[in-house]
Amino acid sequence: MGRRSKRRAGTRPPARGGIDPVGFVSPGQETLERQLQAQLERKLSLSTAEIADFVAKAFAAGDVVSPLGIALSPDSKLLEGQRYYLHRAAPDEGAALPKLQVLWEGEGAIVVNKPASLATIPRGSWVTRSVVVAARRQFGNDEITAAHRLDRLTTGCLLLTLDPKYRARYQQLFDRRQVKKTYLARSRGGDGGEEREAPQVGESFDFQLPMFKETGSLAVSIGAPPIGSKVASCESRTRGLVLGKFPLPEKTEKAEGEGNTNPGNPGYAPEEELLWQLEPESGFTHQLRATLAHFGYPLVGDPLYPIVLPADAPENVEPQLCLHAQELQFPDPGNPGTTVTVTAPAPTWAKGALN
């Protein structure tokens, strides 16, 4: 698990601090400094002067490198199609990283208990604060990658591969739907509603729902995608079982914004809550969250469903999103004929339900 990085020469320079560099393809002709400026102008919302200053500092720091990791100069000339790389400081560098709990270790892979404070992979403003970077630093292995993803606020079982030669065999388990995923969730909606009866403990559900996600949208949409559109879509299916009900908290007056499921934000009003066991038969962005919200059981602490909260809404309230990847079950690639079952400890919010 502590194996050091051994990248093949000529493919990609080593990561720095667990963070991979950004790759570019040279169009040829101009100096490398001008090429990088032009390519960053298409990617960053900065002025020409700011980008020029950024590029100058990157060259001075040795952050622009060849595939072998050799620092390149501003006046370097590359042939069309040649690759070069840029090491960028993470926007959240210096953030405290929790120690990851290893739940299972197999041939070329581990399963960790993902905390809610980390994204799965480095992306956007969550770079250092990602499981991949945290694991690379904790185990001293820059080859670690995630075989699948969990939403940033979701906790629980996450499978990581440790070596490129094992990566495909684990990712294919997910692609071929050979991994059984079981989640715990806590939702509102236990009181029922005008159009439905209150769910009973032990009652099972088979939720089937078309959904799609438009580019740039934070939340998925329910229904068929617009005709002719090229958005990601799915005919989702989720099996649900009501494991228990939580004691009804003291009633309070409902505030403006009724429907808010996060106790730390305006509009939250207590009602009977449910503890669910969920098994997704398909895999789509926010599938479990969007499905339960659509059918009247929004997850406690969800900032997106059924309503999208403002970007500056506080996240440090308790409980946060009540969704936990409780268990992974899959055939062990390292031991043919053997099934691996990995279970993550139940979170605090899942305790206390009456069954």
Annotate each predicted stretch with a short phrase:
Residues 1-355:
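RNA pseudouridine synthases
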